[in-house]
Amino acid sequence: MQYVNGNDISSQSIHEVLELAFSTKIPWTKLEYESSEKHIIHSYSSHERGIYLSKGVAEFNISPENMYELLLDISSRSKWDFHCREAHIIEEYDHLNHIIHLNFTNPLISNLDMNLYRSCKYDPQERLFVIAMRSIELEDGDVDQFECLPNGWVIQGLRGQKDKCKMTFVQQCDLRDIELQRIPGYKSFNSKERLEDFQFLTLFPATVSGRLAKIFESIELYISNNVKDIETKDIRISIMEKAEKEVNEMFGTTNPDYGWKIYLKKLDMEILIKKTTSGYYMIGKGSFSSRYSPELLADVLYQKNPFEWDTFYDKTKLVESINSSIREVEVHYRMWRNTITMRLLQSVKKGPGNFSSVHWRSICSPNYQVADGIEVHYLPTALLNYGLGDGSFTSFLAAIEVKGYPTPWEEEMVTKMFAARIISNQNSIINHVNKLTGGSEMIRELPVIPSVQHHCGDVGSHIGTPQVYNAMVENFADILLDEGNKDGNVVSSKNKRKRNKNNENKNNNNDNIIDEEIEQEEENIEKDQQQTQQQQTQKQQQQQQQQQKTQQQPQQQQQQPQEQQQNHSQLKKEIKPTRPSIRFTYLLSNSSSGQRPIAWYESKKQPFLFLVSDSSERKGKIQRKTYYFSNSGFDNLPEEVVQIIFSNLSAINIVNLSLVCKRFKMATDSPILWKNLYKSNPLFHKKTPKRKQIIHSNLSNDENKVNSNSGDSADGSSSQEEEEQQQQNQQQNQQQNQQQQQQQTFDLSNINLNDPISLLMVFTNGIIPQNLSPTEIINVGGIVSQIDLNDLSNVETLIQQLPHQVLSLIQMNTLDAKIQHLSMISGMPATIGQESPINKNSSDNPKPNAYNKRDNNSYIPDEEFINWKSHYTEKHKQSKRWVNMEPIRITPLKGHNRAIKAVKSEGNSAITVSTEKKIKFWNLNTGQCIGDYEGESGVLSVEYDHTQKSSCIWPLSDYTKVHIGHKNGTVTMVDFIEQPIEVIHTSRPTNLADGFDFTFPGKYLIWEHTIIHYWDVETSTLLWNELNAHTKKITQSKIVAQHELSNKGIVFTTSSDKSAKVWDLTNGTCINTLVGHSYAVNCIEPIGDYMALTGSTDKTLKLWDLRQASTFISSYSTKHTGPIRCISYQEKNGIVLSGSDDGSIIAFNLDNWNLSNISVVKKPIFNNVIGNIGTTTTTTTTTTTTTTTTTSTTNNTNVPEIPKINLGTFKDSKRLHNHESAVTCIESDEAGFISGSQNGLVLRWDF
């Protein structure tokens, strides 16, 4: 099951119904016995897709608008549908989407209830209307109810005929439902009955009694008997009523979450664009304030000469006044170079309360003119004026649909003109109101775009637009929009300037950290609040003084006209020729009905989701997810809507908003908000090459299963007695496993003792209690938080106070043991048994923190219990430190005296190997050595054994067993948690070795000089070897499990012969040879699924596409002054680290890598040449980059062409010089990295 946006389901249903109604690809068959002169019935059966379709078409003597209203009105369904007993709306999401309930009956069934999700398309401009329905499963509904696939009506207006329409209805069902007689109202009386018989008996919501022709007959009968009542109301009034509803919903749904792209965003307005199949939609929405009342603004917007204030209309004409508040207007609208004639409906409302509104939208026009193939239509548009003190606050939304502009440049110009028009009309409205009130001398006119008539005289729209006028309009738009994208939408201009200045300084100092920005913003806001309070106090004092003077000197009242003139003159000087704007308007309640100013950026549409089944048996079934919604005020909005409102803000702006009031503080502390911020922040989700996650232990298990299965098949089938014995053994094993799971103790490593839920899981064996109410969760947290870690004597008493659901998860017979383990992990001395060997070796062992917690397999709490605000802040700091390569701590791990050969880390532990035959085990929390091991022969390689976790509770790592490879070919496994260190296993696959790789469980990869061996540990079998893998000594070998080139894994090798090779791990076949370096290749690292990075003595890094490895795809000349010895790729943060003989480590930041066009190709032919390859690649980097173009061909023309990889940035960020000798090895993870050098120094870098 998954949640799907209800709008997406609506669009899908409507699209499916339209496709069935108008598609010419469906081979319909006309049903002659069902059709008549008035209607035509078609059908189609597809046994391949298992679906049956039927379609009916008829014409009616009624307008399409009235037909749509008739079918939409659910209360009238029972009036024209003789088999419908009851019909009503269960839930209304908006004026186009509803859940309805229908109750039917027919001769074969006494009663049938159906719940349907109804979606509508309403387009009066094209005179096209759609009503689509499909089954929906409610909480109290029948799960096994018959599922109705998308079906419904399509209503079209006939050109040139106002009161006539064509209606098409479609329905579909699964053939399987017909065969099994699952469809209500259908019953096959005889298996030999003809297929078409069920058409008369099938019952669908769009039909009456199942007969496709019956629906036309019943509707036509109802219309003929009630035609006067149906056509009494002018349909244009209904159009405007729906336009008013749609505008309110469009405020909340025209945002990036619904597929809109922001073209321009200013402090008080924004322009959004959404592409369509035939053109695109444009929305301009925003707000402005003025000192004029809403009633006065409505008089100007709805004045006698329509749209006189709109400077983009060449001319307008009143067609008809429908009533006192709605009229039809013909306008000549200029969009850039073209004048388009269209019809609009415009309405005005005043009240209730101190409120007014003006709405308009395009309708089907008999005189509509298309200029140069370009069409422009108005979608529902409005200006809403709310009383604000003595003035008003205006919220506006302008929406148009554009078709026909063929080039991106023309689209850009039209969008620019639309944005400029929005600004020009705001100014024009203020100018017109100012003239109407006679205040033109008080305020300077705001800049507007003049109309063609005003600018060009009597040229007229029929002659064409002069080039001078086009240039003037474009220049005006450029001036108005020059700084359009630099405005903010939350902080004040003063704070914004300060923040920009601070950000510039911080960027110069590489110190742009979120906490410093937050502190600066908080200080600025506090200063602004103090200044505002001081100004208000001064104004109050001045008013009091003025009142005293007025009372003491009544004779001065005669001088008031002179004072007013002086005040007006002063006001004229202070007002600037710019558009006034405000930010927040939650100030007034305009009427008893609760109508109030609602800011343009508030979401006014209820979010609704549906559960959609992933099951193939119930493919289209959807379930309702209930959401409660209120528009009465911000305090009454549900949290879902609050999060939608705040989700578009940045972290800094959210902190600023939290300082406004207590309600905003509570809302901005929501974990959902910070969780969305975290998951949407590109800093945490860089576009870097990533590999699929591989779990090593499962690989060996799968192989064992394959081997055991093959063995069984070779031995033949087992006897019945053996099978019964196997079943008994399996049952016994299952019982034993269940008992062990009940008795085992939950792994306490890395438990957060400060988190009540995490602490509770100690007693519930790691199980998180489910089905707890929010109140119960708070109570449980309160009880668990009372546990005193310094005195655990009250644990049993507190446990008894927990709810039954939680108490049932705790086994009381193991409570004492869990308290004992809890005392150990919390740092208290153990009272039972001997002291832990870990305490002997690392007594000063602090608890893991956010910076050094490195165990990838440690306990990860459920997202519900994560403090997302702290998590976001911490991750933001860490990511910034990685980008700037500024570790919070560098810990030296001292103990070696000679060169470091290898470094491995796991959790908060690490292993280092030096040429002095010594291995050291480290506690990364403290930097202390907690164990030593010295081999008889030189140690070359080490690796943690991940096949089995440690039997002891140890907070540093889950794994304590280590594979050790020696120079004499010996492989030893030790467990360093035991003191002294215990040798578990020893084997000697070969006599000499230069290195080992223990990545693959149960397998050893060994190389010596130019030879590679691959051994099976359990059988002591040499799986394969290559005696001449390279012509010179192998410098490194590395296994990559389950690679795209081979499901079983591949092997990388590098050599002094200037090459690197890729081998198939299963059989040792050479897949690719990477040739391109001028000196020895010393190291290699996989990058993503298809690439590899090599480092060489020639001081360069080269990137290879392993599917076309005839040459490298990019080369990076580093700033190293010596040979590159080691590289490591930390894919979580997109960082490549390279170590060199010059003692430096250089970090490279990877980002903006587009790997979406990479597809899996056929397995390469193992002849060192892929074949049929042609590619050109480039990359952006601050270092010297070599761009290569390669083309090679082979005789095998069946191999498909491999797509190009689009590289991203590979930026040299910083050079670290903490090592005094050559860097020999690097091991990295998300928390930091460890580096070893030639003089034996090991450094731990924590980020």
Swiss-Prot record:
Ranges in a coiled coil: none
Biased composition (Low complexity): 552-566, 707-719, 726-744
Domain F-box stretches: 631-677
GO process terms (BP): cell differentiation; cheating during chimeric sorocarp development; culmination involved in sorocarp development; regulation of cell differentiation; sporulation resulting in formation of a cellular spore; ubiquitin-dependent protein catabolic process
GO cellular component, one term: SCF ubiquitin ligase complex
Compositionally skewed regions (Polar residues) per UniProt: 833-846
Annotated WD repeat ranges: 895-934, 945-984, 988-1025, 1029-1073, 1076-1114, 1119-1158, 1218-1247
Domain spans labelled START: 1-214
Knockout consequences: Cells preferentially form spores within chimeric cell populations and are more likely to survive adverse conditions than their wild type counterparts, which accumulate preferentially within the stalk. Such mutants have been termed 'cheaters'. Over time, mutant cheaters may be expected to dominate mixed populations, as they ensure their own survival at the expense of their altruistic wild type counterparts. The spread of cheater mutants may be limited by the high degree of relatedness within naturally occurring populations of Dictyostelium discoideum.
GO molecular function: lipid binding; ubiquitin-protein transferase activity
Keywords: Developmental protein, Differentiation, Fruiting body, Repeat, Sporulation, Ubl conjugation pathway, WD repeat
Quaternary structure and partners: Component of an SCF complex including at least culA. Formation of this complex appears to require activity of the MAP kinase erk2. Interacts with regA.
Job of this protein: Substrate recognition component of a SCF (SKP1-CUL1-F-box protein) E3 ubiquitin-protein ligase complex which mediates the ubiquitination and subsequent proteasomal degradation of target proteins. May target the cAMP phosphodiesterase regA for degradation leading to an increase in cAMP and PKA activity. Promotes development of prestalk cells as opposed to prespores within the developing fruiting body. Required for culmination and fruiting body development.
Protein name as catalogued: F-box/WD repeat-containing protein A
Native species: Dictyostelium discoideum
